[in-house]
Regions:
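Short, conserved catalytic or interaction motifs in soluble domains
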Residues: 19, 29, 74
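Short C-terminal tail/terminal secondary-structure segment
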Residues: 81-103
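C-terminal helical subdomain
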Residues: 7-8, 26, 45-80, 89
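Short, flexible catalytic-loop segment of classical short-chain dehydrogenase/reductase
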Residues: 28-39, 87
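Alpha-helical segment proximal to the catalytic Tyr-Lys
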Residues: 15-19, 78
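Conserved catalytic helix of short-chain dehydrogenase/reductases
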Residues: 1-16
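Rossmann-like NAD(H)/NADP(H) cofactor-binding core
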Residues: 20, 25, 83
């Protein structure tokens, strides 16, 4: 399943379940320092890259993602469904660049 497939499923579920008052949203988190992530080779370099290149110049924490999830589950987000919320310090807004890319 591709990321586009997954995003389409959120939208389809939101459309199908909205009339029952069920909201469906997703969270796309940036790299997070976790026990599981420590098993990824050179993960510290991924974190460093993200910190240097994300607009907010910081990495995402587990608390950041939890706060976004709590918001989406709360009454404050009653009008939000079928969305993917990026919790990545803005990295998704600048896109991926590679060494040698010309500006």
């Amino acid at each position: 399943m591709t990321l586009d497939d997954l995003n389409a499923r959120y939208a389809r579920l939101a459309a199908d379940l909205g009339d029952q008052g069920i909201r469906v949203n997703g969270i796309s988190a940036g790299p997070i320092k976790t026990l599981a992530a420590s098993g990824i080779g050179d993960f510290r370099y991924i974190l460093r890259w993200n910190q240097l290149n994300a607009p907010m110049r910081r990495n995402v924490t587990q608390e950041d993602v939890g706060n976004a999830a709590a918001f989406l589950c709360s009454d404050l987000a009653m009008g939000i469904t079928g969305e993917i919320v990026y919790v990545d310090s803005g990295y998704n807004s600048v896109g991926m660049t590679f060494a040698g890319d010309e500006e």
